[in-house]
Amino acid sequence: MEVRRDIYQAIADPTRRAIISIIALQAMTPNAIAEHFDTSRQAISKHLKILTECELVGQKQNGREIYYQLEASKMQELDKWLQQFRTIWENKFNELDTILETLKKEK
């Protein structure tokens, strides 16, 4: 039975978010990724497994090496979900700007 991980649980971990940031620039092997952390390669492999299970990260084989790369389509799914909050906060900041301008004119 295949376990499907939730992408929001996956990005809740700061190490996994850091891994995403690192491989967003270029595909990397687990060893290359592990060099960026003060943790074991096995721990990084566990994080990569979780990111792969929720499809935020994909694998590609190049000879004997496996490279991990960011899956942009899943990041777009996250971005779409976050957009609703961006809109809410932009509206609130616009309202605040209006209030501040009104107060400034009253002085």
Short names for language-model regions:
Residues R17-I19:
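Pre-recognition alpha-helix immediately N-terminal to the DNA-recognition helix
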Residues M1-R5, A10, S21-H36, R41, ...:
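C-terminal regulatory/oligomerization modules of transcriptional regulators
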Residues Q61-Y67:
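Short, Lys/Arg-rich nucleic-acid/phosphate-binding segment
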